[in-house]
Amino acid sequence: VRGDDGSTEYRFAARRLSLDHWHIDPESITRHASAPHGEDTGASDGDGDGDGSDAELPLDALDLVIELRTALGLSEQVLPVYLEEISSTLSGTAFKLAAPPVDAAELARSGFQAVETGMTEGHPCFVANNGRLGFDIAEYHAYAPEAATPVRLIWLAADRAHATFTASAGLDHDTLLRAELDPATLDRFADRMTELGLDLADFHLMPVHPWQWWNKLSVTFAAEVAQRRLVCLGYGDDEHLAQQSIRTFFNTSEPSRNYVKTALSVLNMGFVRGLSAEYMKATPAINDWLHGLVARDEVLRATGLAVLRERAAVGYHPAAYEAASAKGSPYRKMLAALWRESPVPLLEPGERLATMASLLHVDRDGGSFAAALIRESGLDPAEWLRRYLDTYLTPLLHCFYAYELVFMPHGENVILVLDEHGAPRRAVFKDIAEEIAVMSPDTPLPPEAERIRAEVPEDMKVLSLFTDVFDCFFRFLSGILTTDGVLDEDTFWAAVADCVTGYQKSAPHLADRFERYDLFTDRFALSCLNRLQLRDNQQMVDLQDPAGGLQLVGTLENPIARFR
């Protein structure tokens, strides 16, 4: 690979796998001085004789990006921010490598949160996948998932006249808070309000990320605090751990209590990670609809699929910032939170949990988490893979073909329920309201959930499966299992094809849809996710029209086409 001006050249050894996946030997990567385009060095064999043009240069990731800025399409506005994201990602990688080593086999036997904080990759599709711009080094150690530092959330009281609380049917604000906070904590909060001459009954309680309070709200919302529309009540008592998605917390003091997802105004992987107060209004209704659909559908019940409902949400509406900013602006996403069900109460005796992203974890010695699970299970690798596909892929196929319902089913949004030996039993989907879409005008939705209906061109609908499942997850998992010698590529993709075929045979009434949205087509469009971030790392896609902003470049050979 030559730099834009031809003055540098990168060389490496790679094994090319399905879906144009390059498994690169990191030890083989070298950087060399090279004659600029159009200059004749007099060296015809590339050995650099006579001009020193083949001299080896030190490797530097920032230099690589700068030398390829034109080829990568990086604008003057995006480039420095992208360099900062790369630097932060490398810093995080260095932190992980400096930690005491835990091999993949040991991690595969560990508990849910040890796996969550011990894995190395959440989104390998993106190069700059751990930007977290806004954290200083102390905040990184306090709040990064891999730091595994216990966090106590800050609680605010928000004047009900300026805040919106919504909840699932049968759940109200007071019932939720009595379940989420100990009586002593609630009493302390109420006493603080009384000291200020205020009545807690006139306010909604809101959990806040500590970073958001100290770096954003305490200054940006100073007027709201001065007017006592917002009252800081201090830290809660429960300890939490940040999850791979960075702004969501798992309660380690009481694991059966809800996850808490908070607004966090840091730039991370293409977005400022706030939460929209406006979006929060419909969140419980969307989750109730999906939960009801899964409960009623025989196929989904048979797969064991569960969804973690976002049972309640609260958002604060700062009048000045809402008047001054457009819909979708980070200024409208500074103060909101939601409560999502914990997966712990779903477990049966002997079962354990692992975020699906962990299947892509490889330890510093090259050991694979997925391979370790397979060995631990005692199953033939092909049988382990079949069980995994039954729990993960089959529900996605059915939701797409029966309802034109799609998820964002990347590794951080799926939790696997494993048996005591590490074999997959069922899948749990999460991050519902912000990530799902219904592409059919005919699938009935309650009025309050209509925002998830999306207009998508017919020829792009099935791309959600090809891109999000095949290219963004199976490509990496297949590559890991293949290079680890666990399964060859043909066996992996044949198993995927068998899962698709098995589902299609079980649903002959959907035959016309299988033909219209053909998963066995010879090729499919390549949706380049990194190009989204390279084009605009502040707002990677328009959430109102996600399909309209895709970067489609060429096609990929479908790895299951030959198994039709």
Predicted feature residues:
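Conserved kinase catalytic-core helix
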Residues: W384-Y403
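Catalytic-loop of the protein kinase fold
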Residues: V406-M408
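Nucleotide/phosphate-binding site architecture used for ATP/NTP-dependent chemistry
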Residues: V1-D45, G50-D390, D419-R564
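Intrinsically disordered, low-complexity segments enriched in polar/charged residues with Gly/Pro
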Residues: Y235-G236, A402-E404
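Canonical protein kinase catalytic loop motif
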Residues: H410-E412
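Hydrophobic residue at the +6 position relative to the catalytic HRD Asp in the kinase catalytic loop
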Residues: V414-L416
